[in-house]
């Protein structure tokens, strides 16, 4: 029977273990209880809870099957320390106050909850032994009930784990209740649903706790009866000792910290919800607690030494059972009573308990959000330690039982008990392992959910910050108070999803709580600006901030901006760095006058946004009469212009002609000390209407320098015109770039020493032809009586005015002036003679003798184009430099000019429209007919007149010397356009009915160079004698169709630009080129021959040098051998004395050798015996020398 019961118990245990785990794997860690949505769970109210432990729905269904066996007559132990309890005492209680409120199955709860505390090692040891004995009790119950209660066994095993989680739920519910109670005064009636949900949750928890206590009471009563039967049936003292150990386990577990914490939590819950517990319950609880303490002390003694007195055992058992049953019943009744009162209480009628201070709530709130993962982690670590310590203790306990049984029990009983205890501990160990895994998985899942929620909240906050961002920010004190309030009020609402929206506004930097922000203590700051922890921002959040438009000033972080403290500011307005750079640049350029550049637009233009007044710095002490406003629509164009152009102040002596025209100011700004007076003289006769009738008038001034001097003028008109914002921006930007294109490199010779009053004179005697070509004579003096009353900088300076004035240095006199636009139809052309002297005095010349044209376009835009005449100022020493060679500059100019259809000008840089084939069209839209288009990138004027004389290209009109042309006194002008003589003859020809041929010589040769073009369809009309491709419709189409090569294009351009009249010259030139090529070829052949000869001679020279080197080497070797031979000879003949000679040595070696040679040559002469002996000795001496 024992074996069968063990097998059956083992099967039921394994089933009970596997039931809550398998659904977790199948359903992605969702709660396996059918119909449970995760609310009310102990471990954090997670819908994905992976076990039935802590599930209130599972407990409710389970307790419905078990009805309470007997009523609870006592409700004692919940008000012992009700007055002194607080939030901080939820985990700190005396060990003497709640002994009666124990239940038998708190043994399992105590093992986990005590691990949670991790403070008392002694209690850990006692609990482990208690756990072991409880399992043995369960084993004996299985033995007694053979037909058994498999289902009940399974439910009891689940209850052991569920009650552990239930106690945690009670404590967490109490913590949340403390936080919610504190917020009752701060929340209005909009959040009543949250309190209702919370009350419902607490009521459910209390009901479940009561049912658990009821089940525990029933089980304790059943086990006590079974234990009594078991003790009567067992005959050995070892069984008595074992029963005594079980009773001791029961009484010891009643004193666990879990029950004390539960009691404290219930008392605080009762106080928080207005429920008052009776005092008699408290008194009785205390009395029972004292009696239980006595019995517990007795049991401690009995646990150490087995007692053989049966009466003592029964007395202890009865007292323990009575205390346990009464305590469990009291706990159950208290839970039911509190839940009922809580459900009947209205949330609005609750009052905050007076003994809960704000400090306790703040502390509770701060500890709460991180409590769940910390507790889970500590549970896991403590369970691992418990698992390691369980196995040795079980073995020790089994061995002790065996030793006791050796004297009073047989071997069979001892072996059965030891096997049961080992099986119990193995099962307990398996359950703890599963619980450990569950806690670890739950911890990871909670961490992942928190990170995901934080990321989502950061993204939503960033998106929302872009929509409802306002430039105005709260004061520092308001920010601090609000942030501190929100920090206090921020609980963790795990259940209600509506609360998550109120926690989203915070700094998106992970781990940043708002401290250290530039803008103050902002936990809810929604952007990265001002955050000291930007380096910790993950790439996901940075990706959302990549498209933020920031302040374009390099190195600007957004701090110090006038209108906001945002680094996402999109303009230069209000930027302190930009303002400081502009001021420093202006001062630096004012001080250095070595290189002069243009200064066009107002400093105001660079600050297009709001708060301009705060950054307006009056420069050099001159005040501004009219404040400037700038349309915001021009922001992009003004910023573009600011990035491309530089502005500069220039001065020459004490006289300044350059005025910085600031729309719509009346007075202009000056640099030199006398400039302010000059400005008053310029505008002394101004009428108020001339400066105030236009809402937005374009402003530009031309600062044209000649050497270090600065001279400029401003166009003026009495009438004002309304400009669109785009036109104004395009004009200002184009003027700023165009005026950079001219520079006069030499100092003026005869600059006037006093500022001049600039006016213009009307001349009613001038006349124009149908094309608007003027006849302007340089020697014709104009009356200087009529002058315009005022110069106001309301009109833009036309490009032709800038180009002409920048091409020469001019001189101003007091009487010189310029006028308003003139009606050309009333003017008569004047001629000029070739005998006119080149140098003209200032008295005989008007600086602005050219009349101004006035043409109106649909937009009512008037473009005055004054064309001044002036004496030569070192014409041969100046160059006109343009930007036309830069494709980017030309492209930008054209794009800016194309923004307005009413203001269409010739796109050639520096061209004012004069000299065009189609007439004097300042508004010409293309390069066709432009005389300067073919010179792009080339200096317009030669640096020396000698170069002009080498290849003279004159005006083709017979009798015209070039004087009086619209473009100036160009004797070398190569087109009839702009020629006053040609215009007059053409008009006469039209009036007489005969076609005008403006060139009488070589008319047939003057034709359009485009092949097959007869001159018809040209822009300028049917010009058979037109000699360029400009305006030819066939040239463009032919080029597009044929796609001419570069050489062909170059040939056509050369024919058009050089004015070649016929192909004969080309043939002649080709022949000359051929002859030159032939001569060059012959010369090249001769050069090749010479090079060949030179190469041959060089090779021979090298050969000779090599031979000489060989000879030198041989000579050296011979000399070396001769020296050796002479030494040998001297050594050999040292002992031989020739007659009449000294012994041989280096000094007389040559003479000695000569004598010997002579002796051997003429041996006949030396026939005497002495000589023969001498010769024989010499032979013997020389015989040893080898040559």
Curated annotation (Swiss-Prot):
Post-translational modification Phosphoserine, affected residues: 251
Zinc finger (CCHHC-type): 22-65, 498-541, 542-585, 897-940, 946-989, 999-1042
Annotated Zn(2+) 6 binding sites: 1008, 1013, 1026, 1032
Keywords: Chromosome, Coiled coil, Developmental protein, Differentiation, DNA-binding, Metal-binding, Neurogenesis, Nucleus, Phosphoprotein, Repeat, Repressor, Transcription, Transcription regulation, Zinc, Zinc-finger
Stretches the record annotates as Disordered: 1-22, 56-178, 221-248, 343-422, 450-514, 686-710
Residues annotated for Zn(2+) 5 binding in this entry: 955, 960, 973, 979
Induction (record text): Up-regulated by retinoic acid.
KW Phosphoprotein (keyword) present: yes
Bias type Polar residues, positions: 344-358
Biased composition (Acidic residues): 89-172
GO CC annotations on file: chromosome; nucleus
Binding site for Zn(2+) 2: 507, 512, 525, 531
Stretches assigned to coiled coil: 1058-1132
Xref: Pfam families: MYT1, zf-C2HC
Binding site for Zn(2+) 4: 906, 911, 924, 930
Positions contributing to Zn(2+) 3 binding: 551, 556, 569, 575
Basic and acidic residues bias locations: 362-377, 401-412, 450-488, 496-506
Compartment(s) of residence: Nucleus; Chromosome
Subunit structure: Interacts with SIN3B.
Function: Transcription factor that plays a key role in neuronal differentiation by specifically repressing expression of non-neuronal genes during neuron differentiation. In contrast to other transcription repressors that inhibit specific lineages, mediates repression of multiple differentiation programs. Also represses expression of negative regulators of neurogenesis, such as members of the Notch signaling pathway, including HES1.
PANTHER family assigned to the protein according to its UniProt record, in alphabetical order: MYELIN TRANSCRIPTION FACTOR 1-LIKE PROTEIN, MYELIN TRANSCRIPTION FACTOR 1-RELATED
Descriptive protein name: Myelin transcription factor 1-like protein
Gene, per the UniProt record: Myt1l
